[in-house]
């Protein structure tokens, strides 16, 4: 699939080691194209919909899956992005030491912080939530998923079913996606992470 090609990983990464279940035409709410359900690890796409939502929802699934691989204190339904931010506040050393985790940590720092203070990206999302009286866009897992999908849309390989609407439209105009410079740095962190993960897994499979 295009996501596998972009990330340069084997299929087991896309399926999250076979733990990710796909559901079509079930669940969700009115107007929802796609959603991820941590309980059961289900990625659901609405019938005749879901276009442009797959990368966003897949990252939610990845964010959930990787939490226990990245942090010692991960509960079953927690996201790595949220745990990373919580650990910055509590200053707890709970991240497993590994180069791949360092790439993810750098990406989360890019999303949430500017020189140790809340990032401009976060401040825009928080202001939008305050105006709409709804806490959603500034949630760590939502900021991370929007960042990931925009990084993918900026790449040469285009797939409007995978991602769409991150470079134009109301959400983009409202500043709910990363600035260009931030997105470019995130691309470096995330693509390096997945390329290194893919290489390590291919070597492991080749040794079997």
PLM features per residue range, with description:
Residues 5, 9-208:
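Active-site-flanking segments in enzyme catalytic domains
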